[in-house]
Structure formats: structure tokens, C-alpha cells
Amino acid sequence: MKRYEITYTENGRFEIINIYGFENYVTFMEENGRYIELICIDEYDV
């Protein structure tokens, strides 16, 4: 299982703050039950 940490910004968008491991894509479930699919790149600069 890959671990992703995301944070929401004031305008409702979100950004990845940490990625542990790599995966082609990941699906997050929001509190209201909506699903968001994010495309992840092979390398991530922190």
C-alpha cells in the first residue's frame, strides 16, 4: 500500500505534500464520499 499525504488549499484545490513509494495513479476519497483520481509522476521533488 502506498501512502500519500495531501493538504487542501483555501480555494478548494489540493496538493500532494508527501509521497511514500511510487504508483501510476492514486484515488483519494473525500469526506463527502467523492473520489478524486490523481496522476502521479515517477519522481517527486520535495
Please annotate each region the language model reported.
Residues 1-13:
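Short aromatic-glycine-(Arg/Gly/Cys) micro-motifs in beta-strand/loop hairpins
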Residues 30-46:
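Short, mixed-charge low-complexity intrinsically disordered segments
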Residues 7-9, 20, 39:
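A structural detector for beta-sheet-dominated domains
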Residues 11-23:
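A short, exposed loop/beta-hairpin motif centered on an aromatic-Gly-Thr core
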Residues 23-30:
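Generic solvent-exposed, charged/amphipathic alpha-helical segments
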